Amino acid sequence: MDEGTRTVLRKFEHIEHCLKRNVEAHATNGFEDVHFVHMSLPEIDKDEIDLSVKFLGRKFDYPIMITGMTGGTRKGEVAWKINRTLAQAAEELNIPLGVGSQRAMIEKPETWESYYVRDVAPNVFLVGNLGAPQFGRNAKRKYGVKEVLYAIEKIDADAIAIHMNPLQESVQPEGDTTFSGVLEALAEITSSIDYPVIAKETGAGVSKEVAIKLESIGVSAIDISGVGGTSWSGVEYYRAKDELGKRLALRFWDWGIKTAISLAEVRFSTNLPIIASGGMRDGITMAKALAMGASLVGIALPVLKPAAKGDVEGVIKVIKGYVEEIKNAMFLVGARNVEELRKVPIVFTGFVREWLEQRIDLQEFVKKRAKLRFEFWNVGFYSYPYTSSSTHLF
């Protein structure tokens, strides 16, 4: 079996396990330690609340992104159906959409249609996806700017996400652990293409140290994807070929940084737009993430099942439920929009507070998340952040 065929088969297995098994983290995402202060007199009307946000030069109706999940099967097969269903929902809701890793498309070009959605979603903000290990200096087939542009332009995407998944690769039977030189390769990409580059984790969170490096090389945004949602070590547990592999994946099932903690670290240490994903399962949690300084919240697993059935309305129903919950939380803290939400009081307790007090200046973080502003202007498709005298928030 050639490498491309193995990659396609792996995509089938990942989808199957996510649909049929419990692959979520056993640990929480940490937002139970983040608290709003209820306002008995919110002094706003609920009907006037505006959930629209700006991100990478585009305005969206809601601060929610469907993050990349799958791709790599042939036309008419499951990944093709999932991406087209999600795209139609994202188009109707005017929210951004990511596709899964396009490595399969590069190795098996005939699978490209499983990522292509422009015929059903001509206006959706679409984010392509490639994996960090393929950019390592010791990768079996090293990717570069050429492969990035191919991944973007073949599906007419608006941006590219480079997913950082060392945890998954380290426990995967056929994992690629060639991560040396990735930062240098990403620096070349950000300086060479006219598209936004999003650095994306895959369920283990981004630390302040990594975030600072990513900002220094010019990435446009970070998807923190922390602990608390889908565990890719958990997925690989079910794919393991022997007891040693199962034991390794089980041991690292909950490895990483909780989403709430990662969000605070990255927000405190950088001025980059942040997608907060990792266990986003209700609108109150999403509102907390936005209040902490996230530009968008990301979801994946909650909409996978209706998407696999081709149920566009089912996907929309899930997301609209989250929207109503976010809106209600904003009403109860007196926030008319996401900018005002970042100024409401929040209180940290428990493990999250203990962690953050050792890692950042927590009081300074609370002040910074309310003051941070971004202005974007475009050169081609690339968005440059500007922070000294901005007039709008994401």
Swiss-Prot record:
<dbReference type="GO" id="GO:0016491">
    <property type="term" value="F:oxidoreductase activity"/>
</dbReference>
<keyword id="KW-0521">NADP</keyword>
<dbReference type="GO" id="GO:0008299">
    <property type="term" value="P:isoprenoid biosynthetic process"/>
</dbReference>
<keyword id="KW-0963">Cytoplasm</keyword>
<dbReference type="GO" id="GO:0010181">
    <property type="term" value="F:FMN binding"/>
</dbReference>
<comment type="function">
    <text>Involved in the biosynthesis of isoprenoids. Catalyzes the 1,3-allylic rearrangement of the homoallylic substrate isopentenyl (IPP) to its allylic isomer, dimethylallyl diphosphate (DMAPP).</text>
</comment>
<keyword id="KW-0479">Metal-binding</keyword>
<feature type="binding site">
    <location>
        <position position="67"/>
    </location>
    <ligand>
        <name>FMN</name>
    </ligand>
</feature>
<feature type="binding site">
    <location>
        <position position="230"/>
    </location>
    <ligand>
        <name>FMN</name>
    </ligand>
</feature>
<comment type="similarity">
    <text>Belongs to the IPP isomerase type 2 family.</text>
</comment>
<protein>
    <recommendedName>
        <fullName>Isopentenyl-diphosphate delta-isomerase</fullName>
        <ecNumber>5.3.3.2</ecNumber>
    </recommendedName>
</protein>
<keyword id="KW-0288">FMN</keyword>
<feature type="binding site">
    <location>
        <position position="101"/>
    </location>
    <ligand>
        <name>FMN</name>
    </ligand>
</feature>
<dbReference type="InterPro" id="IPR013785">
    <property type="entry name" value="Aldolase_TIM"/>
</dbReference>
<feature type="binding site">
    <location>
        <begin position="68"/>
        <end position="70"/>
    </location>
    <ligand>
        <name>FMN</name>
    </ligand>
</feature>
<keyword id="KW-0460">Magnesium</keyword>
<keyword id="KW-0414">Isoprene biosynthesis</keyword>
<comment type="subunit">
    <text>Homooctamer. Dimer of tetramers.</text>
</comment>
<feature type="binding site">
    <location>
        <begin position="300"/>
        <end position="301"/>
    </location>
    <ligand>
        <name>FMN</name>
    </ligand>
</feature>
<feature type="binding site">
    <location>
        <position position="225"/>
    </location>
    <ligand>
        <name>FMN</name>
    </ligand>
</feature>
<feature type="binding site">
    <location>
        <position position="200"/>
    </location>
    <ligand>
        <name>FMN</name>
    </ligand>
</feature>
<feature type="binding site">
    <location>
        <position position="168"/>
    </location>
    <ligand>
        <name>substrate</name>
    </ligand>
</feature>
<feature type="binding site">
    <location>
        <position position="169"/>
    </location>
    <ligand>
        <name>Mg(2+)</name>
    </ligand>
</feature>
<dbReference type="Pfam" id="PF01070">
    <property type="entry name" value="FMN_dh"/>
</dbReference>
<keyword id="KW-0285">Flavoprotein</keyword>
<feature type="binding site">
    <location>
        <begin position="101"/>
        <end position="103"/>
    </location>
    <ligand>
        <name>substrate</name>
    </ligand>
</feature>
<keyword id="KW-0413">Isomerase</keyword>
<dbReference type="InterPro" id="IPR000262">
    <property type="entry name" value="FMN-dep_DH"/>
</dbReference>
<dbReference type="GO" id="GO:0000287">
    <property type="term" value="F:magnesium ion binding"/>
</dbReference>
<feature type="binding site">
    <location>
        <begin position="279"/>
        <end position="281"/>
    </location>
    <ligand>
        <name>FMN</name>
    </ligand>
</feature>
<feature type="binding site">
    <location>
        <begin position="10"/>
        <end position="11"/>
    </location>
    <ligand>
        <name>substrate</name>
    </ligand>
</feature>
<dbReference type="GO" id="GO:0005737">
    <property type="term" value="C:cytoplasm"/>
</dbReference>
<dbReference type="GO" id="GO:0004452">
    <property type="term" value="F:isopentenyl-diphosphate delta-isomerase activity"/>
</dbReference>
<feature type="binding site">
    <location>
        <position position="129"/>
    </location>
    <ligand>
        <name>FMN</name>
    </ligand>
</feature>
<dbReference type="InterPro" id="IPR011179">
    <property type="entry name" value="IPdP_isomerase"/>
</dbReference>
<dbReference type="GO" id="GO:0070402">
    <property type="term" value="F:NADPH binding"/>
</dbReference>
